[in-house]
Amino acid sequence: MAFHRKASLRVPFVLVLLSALLVSACVAPAPGSGGQAAATEKPKLTIWAATTFTPDADTTQDDQIKAWGEANGVEIDLARMSQDERTPRWQTAIESKQFPDCAAIEQADLPKFIQEGVLVETTEVMQALNELEGGFTDGAFLAGQTADGKHWSVPSFSSTEVCYVRKDKLEEKGLALPETWDDVLTIAQAINDPDNQFWGWGKQMGTPSWDSEVSFTAMLWAFGGKTWDEEGKPAINSPETRQLLDFIKSAWDAGVIPPDGPTWDDGGNNRAYQSEIVGMTLNTGSILRYLQTEDQALLEKTAVIPIPAGPAGRFVSGYYYQWGVFSTSAHPELCLDLLEHIFAPDQLRPFYEAGGGNMLPVYKEMLNDEMWQDPARKVLADMVPNTRPQGYPGLTTPWILDAWMDHTMAKMLNRVLVDGWTNDDAIAEAEAALQKWYDQWQQ
């Protein structure tokens, strides 16, 4: 495809290589060994990629990267690693400052890398790609941006959440599918049957769970509240936070949430829905993939619907998976060219198709592609415009992700539900924790 970056801003690599070869032809090799070999030696890029739990998609992208290398005369050293493999390697890289040339960057590390100045600016690439397919979705465009409008990464795909509902249970009670969070509570009470090990709502609230942060934050935005303000300062102390805590507590007190909910990890609500002990829960497409491949009977009893709305609208806290180029690279221009190539729509399309719906598009018009017209997948695609990064309504900063990783919202919720604290006391503790994370990064 044709790219739109200005040639005056970056000379294409092939021209640079050609010029180098012409110069080398006119200049005698320096004394000593290796003069001729050095002039023709291929540049090499070390690239770290992450597994996506969809091997076909991983293979598709690996092939794209290798094909780009062959076409541009670049040696590719590509390592695609699981989370367990990546964690120690990233720890070593951070400690030694010996980074790959470019990589899929861990979400918690991206803002820190930006703050520490170890990434190459990607604004030019982002501007070029943003001209394609209707431009990036709002969340994808903002995920690696700083307050000065500069970009430091390029998005590859996103994830969002939907609501899974036991429509057969609702039909037994003559109830319509929920549109709002108030509907969720009403329905949960109607279908609740704890004597037979069935609870109306599989609400995520476990402190070892990232899903708990996603769920609470999505509901908080829907109720008109926010964890952080536009400038990245704590904003949890609000009437909207108190309203939401009261709402969830009413569900907890009514017994419509499984009593072991506070102990759930990220797989807790998946297991609860898949074992048919809850009537509703939020999740990514992972439950859908399980039902389609492992439990057709439960799939037929399930409705996949958008996240319920609150007084302020419909929101979900999602993730935007980013790649970046490290300033330690000897070939930053090559890395930027590679990212512009593999994250253009014509390369992402086969990657998404190979993923079978696991990865959601980062371009607006790609949400209209045929693969997203399947009814269940379409619900996922339709939630993308409602998906926001963790720092919403501002930018996602290092302190915001530190607080996220510390499960600050889930801890606050459990203070109220499990420990019996008042809203004011729980909010005060959470606000102090948020302020601590904020202050640490201002020093």
Predicted regions and their residues:
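Glycine-centered hinge/linker elements that transmit conformational signals in sensory
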Residues: D183, I187-P194, E231-G261, I307
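Pocket-flanking alpha-helical
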Residues: D58-D62, D84-E121, E133-S153, C163-Y164, ...
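Bacterial N-terminal signal peptides
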Residues: P12-S24
